[in-house]
Structure formats: structure tokens, C-alpha cells
Amino acid sequence: MKYTSAELREKYLKYFENKGHKIVPSASLIPENDPTTLFTGSGMQPMLPYLIGEKHPLGTRICDSQKAFRAADIDDIGDNRHTTFFEMLGNWSLGDYFKTEQINWIWDFYVNELGLNPKKIYISVYRGNDHFGIPRDDEAVALWQEKFTEK
């Protein structure tokens, strides 16, 4: 169950292509039409216009492997969580599916496609923000709990 980065990327993109996603190439590391930043720092950054309502020319299901560079992390390089340049795999629903499908698919990808041991998978869920009145994501918590209790 060892994969090179190229094999993992290809497996991920093919998996979501089979779920009806259109594959888009990585956007430039130097963002176009975004004077707020020097570099593309996340997979979401090039998708932002579509996440806030602009129609994507390829439809409502998009998948990519976005190259990202984070200059702010340079001082933290060397620990087990920070890198400067990396690729973010993303599958995007632009008004199509939501949490149930996303959680089911990514679990299937991890466990059945990659063969990961479910007992070694850790999930984080948005805990909310009292200051802004945003509640914890209890729906996602419940959906993930179902995955971890399935036989």
C-alpha cells in the first residue's frame, strides 16, 4: 500500500472523475487577478470565485491537484506539519452535493481505494466559534461517527 505522490494524485483524480467530477489543472503559483497575495497558498484560493457564486465553465463537480506555496510557514519548516511547497488535492461541489456524499466518498477513497486502516484515521470537524455565533458542525460529527461505527 505504498504510493508515490504521482500515483496518489492520479488515484485521487480518477476516483473523483468516476464520481462525475471534471479535472482542472493546477492554477499558477502566482495568482492572476488577486493583488492580495504573492502566491497561491491553498487549493481553495483559485476556486474562490466559484465558491461564492460564479458559474464554473466545467459545471458543478470539479477536482484538482493545486500547487501551493506558503511563505508564512518558512520559519516552521522541519516540524511534522509545515511545508513551503506542496500540492492540495481537492474535490469541489459547486451547489451540487454536500456533507453526506463528501464524507461517504472520502471514506470510501481512504478505506477501499487506498486500503487505509480505519482505526488509524483521525478526523477533525469544525468546532464552531462562540465569538461569531457559529455553532459546531454537529451534522458532520454525526456522519463521521456513523463511519467509525460501521461494521
Question: Can you describe what each PLM-predicted range is?
Answer:
Residues 1-151:
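Structured aminoacyl-transfer and RNA-binding surfaces used for tRNA recognition/handling
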